[in-house]
Amino acid sequence: MTKKIIENDVNVSSPLGVGGGGRVIGIMQPYVFPYIGYFQLIKAVDKFVVYDDVAFINKGWINRNNILVNGKASMFTIPLVGASQNRLIRDIEVDNLAAWSKKFLKTIEQSYKKAPFYKEGFEIIEQVFSLPVASIAELATAGLKETCKYLGIKTEIVESSTIYNNQDLKSQGRILDICLQEKANHYINPIGGMAIYDKQLFADSEILLNFIKAKPIQYKQFNKDEASFVPWLSIIDLLMFCSAEELNEHLDKFELV
């Protein structure tokens, strides 16, 4: 079957840009300062559900990502207490966040202090890591909300654990139930879910299912030539090198499949 591509200039508030004002939902596990594709999903929907009451993913992106250090991708990892795939994300606490964040903020300062939007970006990061949060889910959600506030993204962000009461359901059945509870008629999922989600299942409930695919983006880092550009880093990198206006332009560079 041929894939249908919907370019990002379509009105995503209405399925396929045709008529009506539908409600668009996105759902994703909480990641701390994730890459730009995560924020593209948030911006593309009316309501974004932080999927915090599902199993933790070991060696995933919930508590780690990459920033630019000396011209190369360098991974940061937030320490956790008792992280296990047998526990829910919302139940996993951060281990001594104050001490870790002090070192991390120093790394950010050393790595980005000459970036054009260092002041604005650093204030966001510092604000998030100073909040009195206990769990990695709370920390990640705070990061999403503060970044969206800075970028002027008005999408409503909620945690799945606070609303839906459907932990007896699994996989796409649970996602579908959230869409139904929200009376959504359009669900957008990250591109990585194409192999496990069934468009017909959603269509049977009169819900359009699309997958969001980020287009390649490039912006000026410290490097002077395009060949040394380091792509797909944490949103932290874009906050340092791009104005809010430019970053929003990059957020619109996607297609729906």
Regions found by a protein language model. Give the residues of each.
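Residues lining hydrophobic/aromatic ligand-binding pockets adjacent to catalytic sites
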Residues: 2-9, 22-257
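N-terminal low-complexity segments that are often proline-rich with Ser/Thr-Pro
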Residues: 10-14
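Glycine-biased, low-complexity coil/linker segments
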Residues: 16-21
